């Protein structure tokens, strides 16, 4: 999927103090992410939870292994937040947390949460955040197959293949 925003120059803004970005080996918590996105001015908090599924194109998956270039990935997260605030100025909170390491089927790999006064902007901003993260962040995954083999998946592979990953 292509970005919903026109191409914009790189913004060197510091994220708002209320925002939260992380690359971590620790398990991710829906409740914690929701709380980080919550604000008394919000009418909506939209959370997107990405998880390890049990197959890719019908081929059984047993686990995924994520690696990231953390400093650059965090800069991409900051840029996503800046883009969101430019397109949807009412957004109060942007939360993006991604796991690294080996994850089993059913485990959460990424959580994105957007806090905003109105649901339509929150949904649009959350969709933009996850789509842009998957396309731009230097985070790689290795699919471990049931037959014992494994395959690395490159950044933006979902968009290049035209599939919904």
Swiss-Prot record:
The keyword Lyase does not apply. CDD domains: MoaE. Pathway: Cofactor biosynthesis; molybdopterin biosynthesis. GO terms for biological process: Mo-molybdopterin cofactor biosynthetic process. It holds the Pfam family MoaE. Transmembrane segments: none annotated. It catalyses: 2 [molybdopterin-synthase sulfur-carrier protein]-C-terminal-Gly-aminoethanethioate + cyclic pyranopterin phosphate + H2O = molybdopterin + 2 [molybdopterin-synthase sulfur-carrier protein]-C-terminal Gly-Gly + 2 H(+). Its EC number is 2.8.1.12. Keywords: Molybdenum cofactor biosynthesis, Transferase. It is an enzyme of class 2 (transferase). Substrate binds at residues 51-53, 118-119, 134, 141-143. The keyword Transferase applies. Converts molybdopterin precursor Z into molybdopterin. This requires the incorporation of two sulfur atoms into precursor Z to generate a dithiolene group. The sulfur is provided by MoaD. PANTHER family: MOLYBDOPTERIN SYNTHASE RELATED. Belongs to the MoaE family. Heterotetramer of 2 MoaD subunits and 2 MoaE subunits. Also stable as homodimer. The enzyme changes between these two forms during catalysis. This is Molybdopterin synthase catalytic subunit. It comes from Nostoc sp. (strain PCC 7120 / SAG 25.82 / UTEX 2576).
């Amino acid at each position: 999927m292509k970005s919903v925003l026109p191409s914009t120059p790189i913004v060197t803004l510091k994220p708002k103090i209320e925002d939260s970005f992380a690359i971590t080996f620790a398990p991710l918590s829906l409740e914690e992410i929701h709380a980080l996105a919550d604000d008394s001015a919000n009418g909506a908090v939209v959370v997107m939870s990405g998880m390890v599924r049990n197959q890719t194109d019908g081929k059984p998956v047993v686990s995924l292994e994520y690696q990231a270039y953390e400093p650059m990935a965090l800069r991409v997260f900051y840029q996503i937040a800046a883009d969101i605030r430019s397109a949807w100025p009412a957004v109060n909170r942007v939360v993006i947390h991604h796991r690294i390491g080996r994850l089993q089927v059913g485990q959460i790999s990424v959580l994105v949460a957007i806090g905003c006064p109105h649901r339509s902007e929150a949904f649009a901003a959350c969709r933009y955040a996850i789509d842009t993260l998957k396309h731009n962040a230097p985070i790689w995954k290795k699919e471990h197959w049931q037959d014992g083999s494994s395959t690395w998946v490159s950044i933006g592979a979902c968009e290049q293949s035209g599939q919904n990953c």
